[in-house]
Regions:
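N-terminal signal-anchor module of multipass membrane proteins
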Residues: 2-59
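Membrane-interface helix-loop-helix junctions at boundaries between adjacent transmembrane segments
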Residues: 76-80, 97-147, 167
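Membrane-interface helix-boundary motifs at transmembrane edges
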Residues: 10, 71-78, 134-141, 201-210
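Alpha-helical transmembrane segments of multi-pass integral membrane proteins
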Residues: 19-29, 81-95, 119-128, 141-164, ...
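Single conserved hydrophobic/aromatic residue that forms the stacking wall/gate
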Residues: 223, 228-232
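Membrane-interface interhelical loops and short amphipathic "cap" helices
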Residues: 32-53, 97-114, 161-181, 231
Length: 232
């Protein structure tokens, strides 16, 4: 099944650069939207917001650029990228209905609502398309590095409620054992997640500067949404 969904290699550098541009547009929009959920959610109760405009216009650019590249390559295969785009589109429509009926999510709600879970899944699959379509399966090019970093940033965002590094005071201020145990376990949990990402990257003989680039990109993304790590 997974082999059937595997994308064809995209070898043209200009097409890979186009994928980076589209990916950055969409995910910057995603982090701006996430910041809005965190900081100014009380001011607007509509789905039609500037940050949703950035996010979904970025999604449109991703889809159009992917279709353009596939057409140029005469690639009419249904792959993981198309599957991810379909899931993301359904999630976006569901999110619009959700917002219209139930309002805007607050607190932990944006991480666990069905519509947002569909958006997360669709985004992961589209990132996997960028990663899996790299020209050389043995090394990571710039586009695949961006895809891996964006995937890690998305993982960090989704698991922020069990991440003590963004709100250390909130995690460690209580002296009760249950809070201390949860805080300690969350440290190990985040270490495990980051280890999976970076150990996987090591198998491609990634240079140290590129490992640093993966971390820098992911941190830059998440600090748009969760800058409290810098202020504590």
């Amino acid at each position: 099944m997974f082999n059937k969904l595997a994308p064809l290699p995209i070898t043209e550098p200009k097409y890979r650069r186009l994928m980076i541009f589209a990916m950055l547009w969409m995910f910057i929009g995603a982090w701006v939207d996430a910041s809005a959920h965190r900081y100014i959610i009380d001011e607007l109760e509509s789905f039609f917001t500037p940050w949703h405009g950035i996010l979904y216009s970025g999604f449109g650019v991703v889809v159009l650029s992917a279709l353009y590249v596939k057409n140029k390559m005469r690639d009419f295969k249904f792959d993981v990228g198309i599957l991810g785009a379909c899931i993301f589109a359904v999630g976006g429509g569901s999110d619009a209905i959700w917002h219209s009926i139930l309002g805007i999510e607050v607190g932990i709600e944006p991480l666990i609502t069905p519509s947002h879970l569909m958006l997360f899944l669709g985004a992961f699959l589209m990132l996997d398309h960028v990663f899996a379509s790299r020209p050389n399966k043995e090394i990571l090019d710039t586009a695949s590095l961006f895809a891996l970093a964006s995937s890690y940033a998305l993982i960090v965002y989704i698991t922020q409620f069990v991440n003590p590094f963004f709100e250390p005071y909130m995690f460690f201020q209580n002296n009760e054992f249950i809070y201390q145990a949860f805080s300690a376990s969350s440290v190990f949990f985040q270490a495990m997640l980051s280890s999976v990402v970076f150990v996987y990257a090591i198998r491609f003989n990634v240079l140290p500067k590129n490992m640093a680039l993966i971390y820098l990109i992911s941190v830059s993304y998440t600090h748009l949404t969760l800058p409290t790590i810098c202020s504590v």
